Swiss-Prot record:
Taxonomic source organism: Salmonella typhimurium (strain LT2 / SGSC1412 / ATCC 700720)
Identification of the protein by name: Proline--tRNA ligase
Keywords: Aminoacyl-tRNA synthetase, ATP-binding, Cytoplasm, Ligase, Nucleotide-binding, Protein biosynthesis
Keyword hit for Amino-acid biosynthesis: no
Enzyme class: ligase
Length: 572
């Protein structure tokens, strides 16, 4: 490709509304342009990267035995009503009616459509297992699209759905998809972790997220510094302290604390170690409970894990925190003065709290706290559960090493759905025993457009994008200095351009009448891995300058050797 016949569209300045580095660089490198909120046009450079990501995904899905299909973006509402998600999904589901007043949606996902297809096409266990996939546009009406294509309303996604007659069969396909995803992200040159995850609104049993490590990530991911243990922070287990609870050394004392309504204020005003404080959070109880509220206690420096808390048998789902009015109606004290002593509602404490002694907590009286509280002496030990977020340095739950926490960008997610959708849509086949059998499902997604942004978040420097070789828009940039004035520069550039293309190498030759500084800046901004610079001065010695984008290393290569050098560098 020649720049004179190409839409380069690079920008010198960073657009003001671009918050994260991937959004900034995708705009500056001429990869995307905004059409409306959360909607983007992919320009040639961006589309080349997107297609490379898509091709790697497709190759590995095919290698794993999945079958490609293509389903409509527009879906009839009756399928969503049949599955129960018409009411559940919320405003992210873009709904509309056609000219016949029939309701439809723009598909944010395709569980209903694929299950409808399978229930009409499959009849026997002999046809299973099957795993269908597509790479197709999705639409979610995000309340606040942001970060460019990282959280857009329209995006390209690979979604796959597998169907089985046994949990064992589902597990085999799930393991195959886990391995395929690992190969996909490894081939793309990404630093990622596969982490245990919550199944969320999609439902089901086992679930893993594939997270690309990046400072701009929206998720906290947890992994051991020694073993393969990794989990989303929502699921990472905080194991109980290994040391026994220390003996009491203080008497419980009622202390006036009129200006201490938060843990931070209590610690500052009374010079308490925060590790000796407990905070009490009140949430709604399940409907058939004798009490309307449940008290959850975590150490002062720890955070409640809402996903873990919501799964407790006494706690209502979705997790709902009590209002001050609701708290006062039950406790007769405000939220800044709550604690376990004389608490009239069920109490659940975190494992770390259960190991505490001589601690401070609210007295359930406005403006007062108890100091020196000890379990079993001052208050009976309540139900103990893991209800906090882990912190860096906690022991790994597998007993190997300690936990690290980093930010991650979710680029893939795999689920064992079980029978949630097949039961709702009555998708069954005749089993081996001749009886009807409801199908067991798995689903497996990759955000193809999000992968492009995540790769940039992990691969950039002050000059622009530093693409991993496998997904770079071009493999080689040829920069002929003053080629419109120097015949030998032009002749060699054209010769190398033809020879490299004949080797199957993707080349961008900058044949613009531009200053060298502009040419260098654009190629580095775009992030092409290999650059060769052809100039009269080096040609006097039969040399060409070669530069590797990732390391910045430069070297002089003889003109007769440069093609073989590049072929070896690119193809190995």
């Amino acid at each position: 490709m020649r720049t004179s016949q190409y839409l380069l569209s690079t920008l010198k300045e960073t657009p003001a509304d671009a918050e994260v580095i991937s959004h900034q660089l995708m705009l500056r490198a001429g990869m995307i342009r905004k059409l409306a909120s959360g909607l983007y046009t992919w320009l040639p450079t961006g589309l080349r990267v997107l297609k490379k990501v898509e091709n790697i995904v497709r190759e590995e899905m095919n290698n794993a035995g999945a079958i490609e299909v293509s389903m409509p973006v527009v879906q009839p509402a009756d399928l969503w009503q049949e599955s129960g998600r018409w009411e559940q999904y919320g405003p992210e589901l873009l709904r509309f009616v056609d000219r016949g007043e029939r309701p439809f949606v723009l598909g944010p996902t395709h569980e209903e459509v694929i299950t409808d297809l399978v229930r009409n096409e499959l009849s026997s266990y002999k046809q299973l297992p099957l795993n269908f996939f597509q790479i197709q546009t999705k639409f979610r009406d995000e309340v606040r699209p942001r970060f460019g294509v990282m959280r857009s309303r329209e995006f390209l996604m690979k979604d796959a759905y597998s169907f089985h007659t046994s949990q064992e069969s589902l597990q085999e396909t799930y393991d195959a998809m886990y391995a395929a995803y690992s190969r996909i992200f490894s081939r793309m040159g990404l630093d990622f972790r596969a982490v245990q995850a919550d199944t969320g609104s999609i439902g089901g049993n086992a679930s893993h997220e594939f997270q690309v490590l990046a400072q701009s990530g929206e998720d906290d991911i947890v992994f051991s510094d020694v073993s393969d243990y990794a989990a989303n922070i929502e699921l990472a287990e905080a194991i109980a302290p290994q040391t026994p609870r220390a003996a009491a050394t203080q008497e419980m004392t009622l202390v006036d604390t009129p200006n201490a309504k938060t843990i931070a204020e209590l610690v500052e005003q009374f010079n308490l170690p925060i590790e000796k404080t407990v905070k009490t959070l009140l949430v709604k109880a399940v409907k058939d409970s004798k009490s309307p509220l449940v008290a959850l206690l975590v150490r002062g420096d720890h955070e409640l894990n809402e996903v873990k808390a919501e799964k407790l048998p006494h706690v209502a789902s979705p997790l709902t925190f009590a209002t001050e009015e609701e708290i006062r109606a039950v406790i007769n004290a405000g939220p800044g003065s709550l604690g376990p002593v004389n608490m009239p509602i069920p109490v659940i404490i975190d494992r770390t709290v259960a190991a505490m002694s001589d601690f401070a907590a609210g007295a359930n009286i406005d403006g007062k706290h108890y100091f020196g509280i000890n379990w079993d002496r001052d208050v009976a030990t309540p139900v103990v559960a893991d209800i906090r977020n882990v912190v860096a340095g906690d022991p790994s739950p597998d007993g190997q090493g300690t936990l690290l926490i980093k930010r991650g960008i979710e680029v893939g997610h795999i689920f064992q759905l079980g029978t949630k959708y097949s039961e709702a849509l009555k998708a069954s086949v005749q089993g081996e025993d001749g009886r009807n059998q409801i199908l067991t499902m798995g689903c497996y997604g990759i955000g193809v457009t999000r992968v492009v942004a995540a790769a940039i978040e992990q691969n950039f420097d002050e000059r622009g994008i530093v693409w991993p070789d496998a997904i770079a828009p071009f493999q080689v940039a040829i920069l002929p200095m003053n080629m419109h004035k120097s015949f030998r520069v032009q002749e060699l550039a054209e010769k190398l351009y033809s020879e490299l293309r004949a080797q199957g190498i993707e080349v961008l030759m900058d044949d613009r009448k531009e200053r060298p500084g502009v040419m260098f800046a654009d190629m580095e901004l775009i992030g092409i891995p290999h650059t060769i610079v052809i100039g009269d001065r080096n040609l006097d010695n039969d040399d060409i300058e070669y530069k590797y984008r990732r390391s910045g290393e430069k070297s002089l290569i003889k003109t007769g050797d440069i093609v073989d050098y590049l072929v070896k560098a690119i193809k190995g």
